[in-house]
Regions:
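Conserved beta-strand-loop-alpha-helix hinge in the C-terminal portion
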Residues: 1-8
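Non-catalytic connector elements of ABC transporters
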Residues: 11-13, 20-116
Length: 116
């Protein structure tokens, strides 16, 4: 359920028209922040992937990870968490305002019920 998705750590929810635009179904879906990758705006997803265009609204550098809040062109927002293998805090923070395409494997997109 959406309650469980929110209760078990950070999770992104795609609902209604936003889900219909991105996933092709108007239900409610969840995708974990660490399963999403940030790509250039012109990047094309593979056949087993889902993509959403947007703009990085906020960057939170957390030492080993960076959390990106991305405002979606379709509406809503997704949070993406990336490990900082070779990214400095200044490089991460400089991404704010950048247009991006978010891409994730279809298998990481889970339908959830709206019950509590």
């Amino acid at each position: 359920t959406t309650f469980v998705a929110g209760f078990v750590g950070t999770s992104n929810l795609l609902r209604g028209q936003v889900a219909r635009t991105i996933v092709g179904d108007g239900g409610t879906f969840t995708v974990r922040p660490e399963k999403i990758r940030i790509a250039d705006p012109e990047a094309r997803p593979a056949g087993d992937e889902i993509a959403a265009s947007g703009r990085i609204r906020q960057v939170v550098y957390l030492g080993p990870d960076t959390r990106y809040h991305v405002a979606l062109d379709a509406g809503g927002e997704l949070v993406v968490t990336q490990q900082n293998f070779a990214t400095s805090s200044m490089e991460a923070l400089a991404q704010q305002g950048r247009a991006v395409r978010l891409i994730w494997k279809r298998q990481h997109n889970f339908p959830v019920g709206d019950g509590g």
